[in-house]
Amino acid sequence: ETVYYPTLDQYRVSSAIALQAVEDAPVYAAADGQVLSVVQDACTGTTVTMELGNGYQAVYGQLKDLTVAEGDTVKEGEVIGNISAPTKYYSVEGPNLYFAMKKDGVPVDPFEYLE
């Protein structure tokens, strides 16, 4: 889906969603899984990728104060960290949770899996 990014003043294709949030708000795991990676990304800041099983992964970005590390098993609803100040790529949009999902490495629409 093509999305307009006010900070960049341009449209870009994005398979993720940016959920407006309040800085320091807790971020909860959307499903049971295992933390596959924790990386620092210029666009999405501190980013956690969780393996959910059956080829599915969930990606959470714009985080700080993580409560999980690579290899940790996480239960649905468990706090994995807090919302950080936005990276420079989201400065106009403000604090947000970057959330994406993949199936077998291919981006899928997260709205199809969230209740």
Language model features: what each stretch is:
Residues A25-Y28, A69, V108:
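Surface-exposed connector loops and short turns at secondary-structure junctions
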Residues V13-S15, E23, A31, T44-T46, ...:
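Envelope-exposed proteins and targeting segments
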Residues L8, I17-Q20, T47-L52, A100-M101:
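Short, acidic/hydrophobic/Gly-rich beta-strand patch recurrent on exposed beta strands
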Residues D72-E115:
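Conserved, short, structured surface segments that act as functional micro-motifs
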Residues A25-V35, V74-G77:
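Generic structural motif
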Residues E1-Y28:
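Short glycine/threonine/proline-enriched tight-turn/helix- or strand-capping micro-motif at secondary-structure
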Residues A29-K64:
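Zn2+-dependent peptidoglycan hydrolase active-site motif and core
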Residues Q40, D65-V68, A85-K88:
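Short, conserved catalytic or interaction motifs in soluble domains
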